[in-house]
């Protein structure tokens, strides 16, 4: 009897699962993070923005423009067409506006075009300029009021408060060493806190003391706040003090001061808390939260009946709070109204709720707790009640009443998703447009003006374009494989506009916080400068309407103390109130806890409690980690640093031509592939009527026919082959949302990132030293690790000043053999095999016309245009770009294709390369066990098993102990057993096969009980001394392939100023011979070698041409001249005003001649025309550079480039 139980993943794969916990909750759809948010934007977000900004009235109030509604029309291109035409997948947006003339009552309604709105594809990405992009969600501080506590050098606790809006000025309170409280308004210099209280209209000291109660801090602050100008009242003076700070040096009046303070904090148009800010402030300041755990200093009675609810001197517990809560929600319970002075910022009465409690510092003293009353959720600005209640909370902290906030707590950080980011951008565009509308209203004739004439959509279009094109959060989608796509869509970044910057982010922000549990993955984050700033959403987490991450828990019944199947989603601050048991806690069949003492979590502590104290229980162990981490079997046996690498490396797996899903999986593979958007999913149930490589047709039960088109060998964003293959047969019955076609790296509907080779952990002739990997030639011969890379190359024929460029087969000075694969138009045929330097698209460009001689003029007159000189500017295969021409696309203006201005024809050629695994490629397992291929050995030389099977891969056993990723060994043994038994297994993270399960399965497979075996040397046939661990592990080939990195320079471009060779593969650059390398040659005394490296091969412009000439003629190479960088140095020093001259041995001045035209003519360097040519090419390249190139090449190729001389410049200084 085998261990575990059988689970079906889709219709085509069965696995034996070792999980022991029943699944009470299905995984949510993994791309909902994106799709739900965009849907909200279309349904509600756009309307919210219009409602905020409209109606727009002119300055006299005659005209008023109102929003009625909007509709999206049919997109111009489908998703595939947008990709092909380098266009944006977007729908035209039409807004219905109503213009009312208030004087005549005339109403004009009109539909106005508001530009194209990019649409989200079904899988959660956008197509912008032909490239697929993802908008990454942003993790930011939530608006609200925050209290911090710190200790000064004398050990006294000092507190600070910050009121953070979504949009608007900050308000900060702080205490100093002398116990005086201060306020900062909008980051200006500080003022005594009582100045702000007086500005609210609470003028006299006695009123302030009555409102806030007597305390040392308040008294010290009042002493500091003296009445300077008796001519002004205290309120007017306070308003002017604040004005003075905000507008220093300007003349101040009471009215202007009042309106400025109003505009900063109380004007709904200028100050916005957003719904989340209002929710957080109401929650923080409400008495419900503040009374808990306090001792009441007054008796509380029912306002209607006078019946006592709670007596004086009672400590408020959970039970008492349950009794009190309904009263605290009433508008007539303990409410106090203050009437501010008429001079205050707002003259309206201020209503707050007040209850007295005893101080925690001095239990005799009464402290008044004040809430901000009951303010509606739709009040987005601050109110005087908010300000006074926040000050009251600040003073109460001195009496140890209230709590300080941790800004890294996920209750205080929220997610801005696509919808909100887009809405903010839309709001910016609309606000810019509003100004234009107002101006036009006052200019145009009110009787004839229409909405269309008032609107200028440019700012809106520009704002949206800018967001999708260049925002830090709009990213080129990672398309190495479906797991990479999915992870990218679920990514949470703390960077970006309004977020943190890499340099300013400290250790605390990056660290794992206890609130990450079930919300953000503690494992998956990049290595390097972004560590901890970019996170991945946990697998079961969802995001609520306020943008806080919620995670599911099973509710424990309060009366029976049994675990129910009722699921509650809790935010981080809700979770702080409960004690939660882990998902592995043993339960009886009826849901009661088996044990008397249970290990549980409470805030950041692990506690041991009795079952009656437990409020909730985890749903499933894998709710803690992200999708990529949940795909690592035996994650619980890996060190977290290596698990992080494993999670990241799975995203870099190159799609293989015949992938196999892992023998040892985790059960997450099916859902990850299904939701990634790479698989083809059935829209409705039915029967397969037709299937081939390009199309699947399914007849629904109601008789309608669905047609599904498969993607064939499309180039993905990362130059990988994106190919779909059918997963169904003729006559199969299909249910809705079944996988009917596998995408790249998929097998039977499951994620299949690599292969399952036979792996031995043994050293072999030092070939696998230091993480090197030794492979069997079988993996090359049988195309086990073969992947396809597809690169596209473009050539454009444009209009130049001298006439149009032409795409043609007639190229000057090119032999017929070079044209053998070109068709009649000069374009390479599909299927041709091309090598470096071959012509892909023949193109000629008119040359500059020089002064013609008499004979040439005669020829010109006889033969017409033909004698005009053209030069060959054909598109050729770049270094390392050879392969098979897979597709050619031609776009012309005549055919109606949209091309950039000045371009008549564009040809795009796709070249596919079949890349077998080879020395230098990077490979990895799922446990962060990465290495590079060091040797590919003949099959017959590989170590073999007793039955003669040669192993496929030899890994070094030394890579395991120090790295502590033992998961790979357990996977190895279980994989071997699974292959022997002919099964696939699933071992979910934290709830999978334990050591006993692994050894039981190994025994059932008839293997030795230690999982090791005798291994024979393939070269001698002798057995090795020790038994070796051999088994099956899922091993991946990563995208870091040696073909993309290998590079050698022959003759190439030089930097314009220093005349030294450029660097990097992208620029066909040289290898830098740096200062330390120079020391090495000096140490050897290799003077001539050093001299040629520093002159001919680098920046001696004249010398390198002469050297080339001498080599060609077979003469002695002349002495080198002065390096160009020396001239540059002299010029730099002269530009600083220093008189620098160069003298020879006899102190005679040497004339440092610049490279003028005479010398270049003498040297036969056509420098100027070449430079002009290069610069023109560069300019064209920049103009046509697609957004994806911007994203992809992070080389610093922006230096000006001088042409390649005929001489060789291998090395730069």
UniProtKB/Swiss-Prot annotation:
Gene Ontology biological process: DNA-templated transcription
The keyword Transferase is annotated on this UniProt entry: yes
Molecular function terms from GO: DNA binding; DNA-directed RNA polymerase activity; ribonucleoside binding
EC supergroup of this enzyme: transferase
Keywords attached to this entry: DNA-directed RNA polymerase, Nucleotidyltransferase, Transcription, Transferase
Catalyzed chemical reaction(s): RNA(n) + a ribonucleoside 5'-triphosphate = RNA(n+1) + diphosphate
Any Gene Ontology CC annotation: DNA-directed RNA polymerase complex
Family annotation (Gene3D superfamilies): 2.40.50.100, 2.40.50.150, 3.90.1100.10, DNA-directed RNA polymerase, beta subunit, external 1 domain, DNA-directed RNA polymerase, subunit 2, domain 6, RNA polymerase alpha subunit dimerisation domain, RNA polymerase Rpb2, domain 2
This enzyme's EC code(s): 2.7.7.6
Chain intervals with Basic and acidic residues compositional bias: 1171-1198
Keyword hit for Iron-sulfur: no
Region spans: Disordered: 1153-1213
Complexes and interactors: The RNAP catalytic core consists of 2 alpha, 1 beta, 1 beta' and 1 omega subunit. When a sigma factor is associated with the core the holoenzyme is formed, which can initiate transcription.
Family: Belongs to the RNA polymerase beta chain family.
Its biological purpose: DNA-dependent RNA polymerase catalyzes the transcription of DNA into RNA using the four ribonucleoside triphosphates as substrates.
NCBIfam families from the UniProt entry: PRK00405.1, rpoB
Protein name (database record): DNA-directed RNA polymerase subunit beta
Protein source organism: Lactobacillus acidophilus (strain ATCC 700396 / NCK56 / N2 / NCFM)
């Amino acid at each position: 009897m085998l261990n575990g139980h059988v689970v079906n993943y889709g219709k085509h794969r069965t696995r034996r699962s070792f999980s022991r916990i029943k699944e009470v909750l299905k995984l949510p759809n993994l791309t909902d993070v994106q799709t739900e948010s965009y849907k909200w934007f279309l349904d509600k977000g756009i309307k919210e923005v219009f409602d905020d900004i409209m109606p727009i009235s002119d300055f006299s109030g005659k005209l008023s423009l109102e929003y009625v509604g909007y509709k999206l029309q049919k997109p111009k291109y489908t998703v595939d067409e947008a990709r092909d035409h380098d266009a944006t997948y977007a729908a035209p947006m039409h807004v219905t506006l109503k213009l009312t003339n208030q004087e005549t009552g005339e109403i004009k309604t009109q539909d106005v075009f508001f530009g194209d709105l990019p649409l989200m594809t079904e899988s959660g990405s956008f197509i912008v300029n032909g490239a697929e992009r993802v908008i990454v969600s942003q993790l930011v501080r939530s608006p609200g009021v925050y209290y911090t506590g710190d200790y000064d050098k004398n050990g006294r606790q000092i507190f600070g408060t910050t009121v953070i809006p979504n949009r608007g000025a900050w308000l900060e309170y702080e205490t100093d060493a002398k116990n005086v409280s201060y306020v900062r308004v909008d980051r200006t210099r500080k003022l005594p806190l009582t100045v702000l209280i007086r500005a609210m209209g609470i003028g006299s000291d006695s009123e302030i003391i009555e409102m806030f109660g007597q305390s040392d801090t308040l008294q010290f602050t009042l002493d500091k706040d003296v009445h300077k100008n008796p001519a002004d009242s205290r309120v007017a003076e306070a308003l002017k003090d604040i004005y003075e700070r905000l507008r220093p040096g300007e003349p101040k009046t009471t009215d202007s001061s009042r309106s400025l303070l109003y505009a900063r904090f109380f004007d709904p148009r200028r100050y916005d808390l957003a719904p989340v800010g209002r929710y957080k402030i109401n929650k923080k300041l409400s008495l419900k939260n503040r009374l808990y755990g306090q001792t009441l200093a007054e008796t509380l009675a029912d306002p209607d009946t006078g019946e006592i609810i709670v007596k004086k001197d009672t400590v408020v517990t959970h039970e008492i709070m349950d009794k009190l809560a309904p009263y605290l929600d009433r508008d007539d319970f303990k409410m106090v109204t203050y009437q501010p002075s008429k001079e205050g910022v707002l003259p309206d009465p201020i209503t707050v709720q007040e209850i007295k409690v005893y101080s925690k510092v001095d239990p005799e003293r009464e402290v008044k707790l004040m809430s901000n009353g009951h303010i509606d959720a739709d009040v987005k600005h601050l109110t005087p009640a908010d300000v006074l209640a926040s000050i009251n909370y600040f003073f109460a902290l001195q009496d140890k009443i209230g709590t300080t906030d941790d800004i890294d707590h996920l209750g205080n950080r929220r997610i801005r998703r696509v919808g909100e980011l887009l809405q903010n951008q839309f709001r910016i565009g609309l606000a810019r447009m509003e100004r234009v509308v107002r101006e036009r209203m006052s200019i145009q004739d009110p009787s004839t003006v229409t909405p269309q004439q008032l609107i200028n959509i440019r700012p809106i279009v520009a704002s949206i374009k800018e967001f999708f094109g260049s925002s830090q959060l709009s990213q080129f989608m990672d398309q190495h494989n479906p797991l990479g796509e999915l992870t990218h869509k679920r990514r949470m970044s703390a960077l970006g506009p309004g977020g943190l910057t890499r340099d300013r982010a400290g250790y605390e922000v990056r660290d794992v916080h206890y609130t990450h549990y079930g919300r953000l993955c503690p494992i998956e984050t990049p290595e390097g400068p972004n560590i901890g700033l970019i996170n991945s959403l946990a697998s079961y987490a969802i995001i609520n309407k306020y943008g806080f991450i919620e995670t599911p828990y099973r509710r424990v019944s309060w009366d029976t103390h049994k675990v129910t199947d009722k699921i509650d989603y809790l935010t981080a601050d809700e979770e702080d109130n409960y004690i939660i048991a882990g998902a592995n806690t043993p339960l009886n069949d009826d849901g009661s806890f088996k044990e008397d003492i249970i290990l549980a979590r409470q805030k950041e502590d692990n506690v041991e409690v009795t079952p009656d104290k437990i409020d909730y229980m985890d749903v499933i162990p894998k709710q803690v980690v992200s999708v990529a981490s949940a795909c690592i079997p035996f994650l619980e046996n890996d060190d977290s640093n290596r698990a992080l690498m494993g999670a990241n490396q799975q995203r870099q797996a190159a799609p293989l031509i015949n992938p196999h899903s892992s023998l040892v999986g985790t059960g997450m593979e099916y859902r990850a592939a299904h939701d990634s958007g790479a698989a083809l999913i059935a829209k409705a149930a039915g029967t397969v009527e037709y299937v081939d490589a390009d199309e699947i047709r399914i007849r629904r039960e109601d008789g309608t026919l669905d047609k599904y088109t498969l993607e064939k060998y499309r180039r993905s964003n990362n130059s990988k082959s994106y190919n779909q293959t059918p997963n169904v047969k003729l006559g199969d019955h299909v249910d809705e949302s079944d996988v009917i076609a596998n995408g790249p790296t998929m097998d039977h509907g499951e994620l299949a990132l690599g292969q399952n080779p036979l792996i031995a952990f043994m050293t072999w002739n030092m070939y696998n030293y230091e993480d090197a990997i030794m492979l069997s030639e079988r993996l090359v011969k049988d195309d086990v690790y073969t992947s396809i890379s597809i690169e596209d190359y473009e050539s454009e024929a444009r209009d130049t000043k001298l006439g149009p460029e032409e795409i043609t087969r007639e190229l000057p000075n090119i032999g017929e053999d070079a044209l053998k694969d070109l068709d009649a138009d000069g374009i390479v045929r599909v299927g041709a095999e091309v090598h470096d330097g071959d012509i892909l698209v023949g193109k000629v460009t008119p040359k500059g016309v020089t002064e013609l001689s008499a004979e040439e003029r005669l020829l010109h007159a006889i033969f017409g245009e033909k004698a005009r000189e053209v030069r060959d500017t054909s598109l050729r295969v770049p270094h390392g770009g050879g392969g098979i021409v897979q597709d050619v696309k031609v776009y012309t203006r005549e055919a109606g294709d949209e091309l950039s201005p000045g371009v008549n024809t564009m040809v795009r050629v796709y070249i596919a390369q079949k890349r077998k695994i080879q020395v230098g490629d990077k490979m990895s397992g799922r446990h962060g066990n990465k290495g590079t291929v060091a040797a590919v050995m003949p099959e017959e030389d590989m170590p073999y098993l007793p039955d003669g099977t040669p192993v496929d891969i030899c890994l070094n056993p030394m890579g395991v102990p120090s790295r502590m990723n033992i998961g790979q060994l357990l996977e190895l043994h279980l994989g071997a057993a699974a292959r022997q038994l002919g099964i696939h297994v699933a071992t979910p993270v934290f709830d999978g096969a334990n050591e006993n399960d692994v050894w039981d399965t190994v025994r059932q497979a008839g293997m030795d009980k230690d999982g090791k075996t005798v291994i024979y040397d393939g070269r001698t046939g002798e057995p090795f001394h020790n038994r070796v661990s051999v088994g099956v592990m899922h091993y991946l080939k990563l995208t870091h392939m040696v073909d993309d990195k290998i590079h050698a320079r022959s003759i190439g471009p030089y930097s314009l100023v220093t005349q030294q060779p450029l660097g990097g593969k992208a620029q066909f650059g040289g290898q830098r011979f740096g200062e330390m390398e120079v020391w090495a040659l000096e140490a050897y005394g290799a003077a001539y070698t050093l001299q040629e490296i520093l002159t001919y091969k680098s920046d001696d412009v004249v010398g390198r041409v002469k050297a080339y000439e001498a080599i060609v003629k077979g003469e002695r190479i002349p002495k080198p001249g002065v390096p160009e960088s020396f001239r540059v140095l002299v010029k730099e020093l002269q530009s600083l005003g220093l008189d620098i001259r160069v003298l020879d041995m006899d102190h005679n001045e040497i004339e440092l001649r610049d490279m003028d035209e005479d010398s270049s003519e003498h040297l036969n360097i056509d420098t100027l025309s070449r430079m002009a040519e290069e610069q023109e090419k560069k300019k064209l390249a920049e103009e046509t550079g697609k957004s994806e190139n911007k994203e992809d090449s992070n080389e610093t190729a922006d230096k000006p480039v001088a042409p390649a001389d005929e001489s060789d410049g291998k090395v730069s200084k």
